[in-house]
Amino acid sequence: MDTEALANYLLRQLSLDAEENKLEDLLQRQNEDQESSQEYNKKLLLACGFQAILRKILLDARTRATAEGLREVYPYHIEAATQAFLDSQ
């Protein structure tokens, strides 16, 4: 094998190694993105659950205020609704 053929062979091998490294980097980034996505989904699920709890409490507080003939919800309505929610769990 002459020098030029050897140089071409080595360049091809280096190019293949670079492509393999690019592929490995791409796969690693995809795995990191999937992990980040899973963490985001967990946080989103917790936020949705928290929002549902707050909505339930606020609707109960509004019902309590309406039962008293009031148009506004006062802090004691929210406190009573929160306590009722906690007691039901």
Swiss-Prot record:
<keyword id="KW-0137">Centromere</keyword>
<comment type="similarity">
    <text>Belongs to the CENP-W/WIP1 family.</text>
</comment>
<comment type="function">
    <text>Component of the kinetochore, a multiprotein complex that assembles on centromeric DNA and attaches chromosomes to spindle microtubules, mediating chromosome segregation and sister chromatid segregation during meiosis and mitosis. Component of the inner kinetochore constitutive centromere-associated network (CCAN), which serves as a structural platform for outer kinetochore assembly.</text>
</comment>
<comment type="subunit">
    <text>Component of the inner kinetochore constitutive centromere-associated network (CCAN) (also known as central kinetochore CTF19 complex in yeast), which is composed of at least AME1, CHL4, CNN1, CTF3, CTF19, IML3, MCM16, MCM21, MCM22, MHF1, MHF2, MIF2, NKP1, NKP2, OKP1 and WIP1.</text>
</comment>
<keyword id="KW-0539">Nucleus</keyword>
<dbReference type="GO" id="GO:0019237">
    <property type="term" value="F:centromeric DNA binding"/>
</dbReference>
<dbReference type="GO" id="GO:0000776">
    <property type="term" value="C:kinetochore"/>
</dbReference>
<keyword id="KW-0995">Kinetochore</keyword>
<dbReference type="GO" id="GO:0005634">
    <property type="term" value="C:nucleus"/>
</dbReference>
<keyword id="KW-0158">Chromosome</keyword>
<dbReference type="GO" id="GO:0007059">
    <property type="term" value="P:chromosome segregation"/>
</dbReference>
<protein>
    <recommendedName>
        <fullName>Inner kinetochore subunit WIP1</fullName>
    </recommendedName>
</protein>
